[in-house]
Amino acid sequence: MGPTSRNHKSSQKDVAPNEAKPPRYPQRNRSITASASASAFASPAVANSRVAKERPSSSTAGEGEPQETVLKLPSIPTLPARMAKLVPLEGLGCEAAVGSLTPSREREYKVTNKHTEGRRPVYAIVFNFLDVRYYDIFATACGPRLSTYRCLMNGKFALLQSYLDDDMNESFFTVSWACDIDGNPLLVAAGSTGIIRVINCATEKIYKSLVGHGGSVNEIKSQPSNPSLIISASKDESIKLWNVQTGILILVFGGVGGHRHEVLGVDFHTSDIYRFLSCGMDNTVRIWSMKEFWEYVEKSYSWTDATSKFPTKFVQFPVLCAEIHSNYVDCTKWLGDFVLSKSVENEILLWESITKEENPGEGHIDVLQKYPVPECNIWFMKFSCDFHHNQLAIGNRDGKVYVWKVQTSPPVLIARLNNPQVKSAIRQTAVSFDGSTILACTEDGNIWRWDEVDHPTAPVPSKKQK
């Protein structure tokens, strides 16, 4: 079967992403083994609601006659006016600025290191931007293994810690950084089993195991201003907000106005603590708000009863649903109040939503810029930005990395990174704090590092030399 634009990523060993079938995900709570042995703490799973079946009373049925079973279906509420379903404007004057694929060479990079994680795909790689002490530390997810490294000045890596799940069939798809109440770094990861592992890197022990999703978890993000809050995007079509400090499931986003297929990506707003983005296989990008339910977020910190008794709330309607792509949307990020989103259409879009104040349910999408990415037509290929969102790096299926200058119009391609030895699809990139180092993880189990080339400045001649 040839590759198509709607391929499933592989979660099985030695299976190509375009040929893999979606695995079944058993709901078992497995422990994970750290470099120092520790026990896992599992929060109880959220019970699935069942549709009740009621029989008519004996007074309404004749004696000896078979009684009918009446199935009561829940009523579906209408979409509220506050939810805007927007599409892009088309026509003269609505054209987006498209970047050129000719590199400007504003910054030049060279390959400085290659590290082999294993034989299974490395699906995730991310720097720790939550604490200035750890800006040069990054984490990776490869099969059932999580690893943390430090970027050294000579272009090399220093392995700090490594964690191995007891279930060797686990395949971690996402990894993120969080913090506990004392500021210790927490490593948060999840994958095919749907169980979220929270590891305290300072104590080298399991901090929490969060159970609640009914399918694999595709992405986890922590809130920049409150890193003990995380959101998780799942195959079960829902997004969940967790407090990793207490292990409480606070909010569940999904339902009538939620995603209609697997959720692939999420991202917290950098300055608005209430809003976040989500995207998925239903070709949409949605903006959600937690403002009306923030009291439950605050309550989750002081909750002393069992986590299963916490009054978890369900949020069914997003603020906005953007139908801007015609295929799977696997990555999205905020750029201020603008949105960057990527589908399997060989480009990244920068857009904003325009709604009417008198009628928030009406409006349109204004596509501002397009960042072309050739040979990027398979899903689960995620881009990343530096700390200040000045530049963006995205890999493709041929092993090339495109580095774009984000905050210019039209977009400027800073560099195109390639190496003859990189022949596998790049699943995710990681850009360092200042953009001087770019990392990429590949389908064949490798991590590649590019570092900026320093060009010595020519000395200014003195008056005597003149």
UniProtKB/Swiss-Prot annotation:
Keywords: Chromatin regulator, Developmental protein, Differentiation, Repeat, Transcription, Transcription regulation, WD repeat
Chain intervals with Basic residues compositional bias: 1-10
Gene Ontology process terms (BP): cell differentiation; embryo development ending in seed dormancy; endosperm development; flower development; heterochromatin formation; negative regulation of transcription by RNA polymerase II; seed development
WD repeat extents: 167-209, 212-252, 258-298, 324-361, 374-414, 421-460
One GO CC annotation: PcG protein complex
Similarity annotation: Belongs to the WD repeat ESC family.
Other information: The FIE1 locus is imprinted. Maternal inherited gene is expressed in the ovule (the egg and the central cell), while the paternal inherited gene is silenced in the pollen. After fertilization, only the maternal inherited allele is expressed. The gain-of-function epi-allele (Epi-df) plants exhibit dwarf phenotype, defect in flower development and very poor seed set. Plants silencing FIE1 have delayed embryo development, reduced seed set, and reduced grain length, width and weight.
Subunit structure as annotated in this protein's UniProt entry: Interacts with EZ1 and CLF. Component of the polycomb repressive complex 2 (PRC2), which methylates 'Lys-27' residues of histone H3 (H3K27me3), leading to transcriptional repression of the affected target gene.
Name of the protein described by the UniProt record: Polycomb group protein FIE1
Lineage of origin: Eukaryota, Viridiplantae, Streptophyta, Embryophyta, Tracheophyta
